[in-house]
């Protein structure tokens, strides 16, 4: 059976474009969002995202990580919690204490950029770790953080699994706030599965390609990364 994907967006397919289309119900010719760091004030006023529409309709909302959700809205009434995406220009969150996580999170994104690096922003990591329990980080996640550090030392390519760990940490915080505030509408967004698919599809499905620019050792190292990312999401 042939499956066809249809989208009204013009130009190349990009999550930075497609998600605003979904959130706002109009295509990119109208919302004109195509990259991070755009000033969205006028766009948000004319074509507000779903979470702002619900808030304005007196429906309480919990929003975590949706793309193009920075900065914090000027009006926070009816938002139970609000955590902008991992590409935000600043760490501001609501409630304010989540900013300890977001500050660390954004620094990690800056350090790793396209390829995950083994560096750690020490100052932000310490502040974040001192607030683990207040933020809702589970004992299992704390164990997994510790385990990840040791695994990276033994097998250096395991550093790429930090993306999945970041999503796991994020979900702990989301879930804590979900249980605490019980919003009528809530969303949680993670990009770690898509990121693994973009980078390691060839390692998982080498037979899909006629010309392979990577050697067998690279494929062997990374052929389980998509599965690992998806299994992490399944455990949320």
Residue ranges and their predicted role:
Residues 25-219:
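His/Asp/Glu-rich, glycine-adjacent segments
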Residues 13-18, 45, 49, 169, ...:
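Generic alpha-helix structural propensity
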Residues 1-18, 60-64:
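Short, structured active-site-proximal loop/turn typified by the sulfatase FGly-forming signature C/S-X-P-X-R
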Residues 42-45, 227-231:
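A short beta-strand-to-alpha-helix junction
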Residues 1, 228-236:
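Metal-dependent active-site segment of extracytoplasmic phospho-/sulfohydrolases and closely related
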Residues 219-229:
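Membrane-interface transmembrane-helix boundary segments in multi-pass integral membrane proteins
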């Amino acid at each position: 059976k042939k499956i066809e994907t249809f989208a009204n967006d013009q130009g190349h397919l990009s999550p930075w474009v497609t998600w605003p289309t979904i959130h706002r119900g109009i295509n990119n010719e109208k919302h004109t969002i195509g990259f991070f760091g755009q000033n969205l004030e006028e766009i948000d006023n004319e074509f507000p995202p779903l979470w702002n529409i619900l808030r304005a309709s007196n429906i309480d909302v919990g929003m975590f990580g949706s793309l193009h959700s920075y900065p914090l809205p000027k009006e926070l009434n009816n938002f139970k919690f609000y955590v902008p995406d991992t590409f935000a220009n600043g760490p501001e969150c609501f409630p304010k204490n989540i900013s300890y996580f977001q500050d660390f999170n954004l620094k990690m994104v800056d350090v790793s950029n396209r390829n995950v690096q083994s560096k750690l922003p020490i100052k932000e990591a310490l502040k974040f770790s001192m607030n683990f329990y207040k933020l809702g980080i589970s004992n299992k996640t704390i164990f997994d953080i510790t385990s990840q550090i040791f695994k990276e030392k033994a097998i250096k390519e395991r550093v790429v699994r930090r993306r999945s760990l970041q999503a796991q940490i994020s979900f702990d915080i989301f879930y804590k706030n979900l249980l605490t505030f019980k919003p009528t509408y809530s969303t949680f967004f993670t990009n770690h599965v898509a990121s693994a698919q973009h980078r390691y599809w060839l390692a998982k499905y080498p037979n899909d390609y006629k010309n392979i620019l990577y050697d067998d050792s690279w494929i062997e190292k990374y052929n389980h990364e998509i599965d690992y990312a998806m299994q992490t999401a399944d455990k949320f």
